Amino acid sequence: MEVREKKDEKMEMTRRKSSALDHHRLPPYTYSQTANKEKPTTKRNGSDPDPDPDLDTNPISISHAPRSYARPQTTSPGKARYRECQKNHAASSGGHVVDGCGEFMSSGEEGTVESLLCAACDCHRSFHRKEIDGLFVVNFNSFGHSQRPLGSRHVSPIMMSFGGGGGCAAESSTEDLNKFHQSFSGYGVDQFHHYQPKKRFRTKFNEEQKEKMMEFAEKIGWRMTKLEDDEVNRFCREIKVKRQVFKVWMHNNKQAAKKKDL
């Protein structure tokens, strides 16, 4: 009897201990949730085989706009024109004398050495004022290669006149510098008197040639175009005048003829 009672007491104590342990133990699902929350969220090598569904693991993509290395388009430069000649023929003596040529006229075909020389004034194209679609371009070559000596008197530019304008003269020529010398004789400037203009061959025209050239120039509008090359060449052979000489004559007489029409 006593042995049985002790056995029952022992079983009762074991049952109570087991009940006490079950009271302090957490439920299975609660433990698993707590364990998942305590897992570290750091990723290795940018990947995680079992990501936490509660956390937003979608990567943020940042895209850069493609960089363009193409050069910006620029407007093509306009056609260059060469206007009045600005060569200083008295630069070596400290004066300022221009020849009065109003526009560059090529002496030869494009691509040749003669194409860079003006048929009217025989100066290089670089001495003429360059103009691109109305823009003024400063040409430093036109101011001469020598500087004005210190202490010299300021001299206003003098223009050498071209003959043959208006059909009054019988030839297309450049006047000498007599007026230039006379204008400075009163100031005692003797250093300019040694300047001598270079001699150029001048073509003389008779009255019949001048009349025919005037009529033909008005017919073609005082300009030569490629469409009229054959007609111009035939006319020049007829009056026995070179094509380039006729071109220079039109250049020198164009403005005077237009003034007469007005």
UniProtKB/Swiss-Prot annotation:
Keywords for this protein: DNA-binding, Homeobox, Metal-binding, Nucleus, Transcription, Transcription regulation, Zinc, Zinc-finger
Subcellular location: Nucleus
Binding region for DNA: 198-261
Residues marked Required for DNA-binding (site): M250
Ranges of Basic and acidic residues composition bias in the record: 1-25, 36-47
ZnF (ZF-HD dimerization-type) ranges: 82-131
InterPro entries: Homeodomain-like_sf, Homeodomain_ZF_HD, ZF_HD_homeobox_Cys/His_dimer
Expression sites by tissue: Expressed in seedlings, roots, leaves, stems, flowers and inflorescence.
GO molecular function ontology, one term from the record: DNA binding
GO cellular component assignments: nucleus
Source organism superkingdom: Eukaryota
Region (Disordered): 1-93
Subunit-structure text: Homo- and heterodimer with other ZFHD proteins. Interacts with MIF1 and MIF3; these interactions prevent nuclear localization and DNA-binding to inhibit transcription regulation activity. Binds to ZHD1, ZHD2, ZHD10 and ZHD11.
Described function: Putative transcription factor.
Domain text: The homeodomain differs form the typical one by having namely 4 instead of 3 extra amino acids inserted in the loop between helix 1 and helix 2.
Protein name (database record): Zinc-finger homeodomain protein 6
